[in-house]
Amino acid sequence: LKRCKESVWKYKGMWEDFSATVGFWADMEHPYVTYDNNFIESEWWALKQIWEKGLLYKGFKIVPYCPRCGTPLSSHEVAQGYKDVKERSAIAKFKAKGEDAYILAWTTTPWTLPSNVALCVNANEDYVKVESKGDTYYLAQALCDTVLGEGEYTVLETYKGADLEGKEYEPLYQFVSPKEKCWYVVCDDYVTLTDGTGVVHIAPAFGEDDAKVGRKYGLPLVQLVDGKGQMTPETKWPGGFCKDADKEILKDLDERGLLFSAPKFEHSYPFCWRCDTPLIYYARESWYIKMTDVKGELIQNNNTVNWLPESIGKGRFGDWLENVQDWAVSRNRYWGTPLNIWECECGHRHAIGSI
């Protein structure tokens, strides 16, 4: 804590120098210091007002999470650390139950494959069963040329995505045995035919879209990565950082004949602005402010602000408000303002508004 307090005053001086350089006016003689009780009390007061309006809640949601810092990040923090990276994606072969055929599913996060519980297709798109080079596959019709090669396949049957709903397959890994039904095809319109195979692998513990589909179908939450971002003891790669496990998982699938291909994929990926660790989208229990409930008011108020230049208010900031998400305000660390919610064993919660 002593080191943390020292850093406050170190950065106070740097902030004053920076503010003077850019011509920003502020009351430098009376700065707010986050560890000061007066500041903590002001935060508690504000949080209690939010609590009394029913806008503060505890939820189990997918959050951008830094495994090195051990804490979720807000959308503002995530926006500070994006980098363009090239990584190996995976087109995995999921064997259809009861037939000698495979469902081809694409993912940019191979480390989530051990936690797979379903495959998702778009109910309204066209899918095919094809024969290619001695093997039989299911995938989106529009992506056959891209995935298999033009003229390198024969269409055996044609379906709508909805026709495949409920089709069961054999899991790539079975490190756990969930009680809930899993390992079957589900449908959702978030699946597009822009990339991949038109079939998306679902791991509800590691993605907002996955979690939404999981809630829709009552899928189990299989979380084979711990709070440090390490693969859990149930897997073949215990203790290794999850993103570093990509290579081992791809190698393992290839050796077992369950990897169709592992194309390189360039995309923008978030890194922790504090420590430069790759973030993961991770199911965590956190406290949230229901920004989505006041979205309309935020947009209305923003329209009354005289922005200069106007494009910032209507564009960058306005676009952010249009897509605002519930704000994860709690952090899993010792340093910071204590959350003002007291919870007893019976589940009763009380919000403190002052010291």
Q: Model segments located where?
A:
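Catalytic alpha/beta core of large soluble enzyme barrels
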Residues: 115-121, 125-227, 254, 294
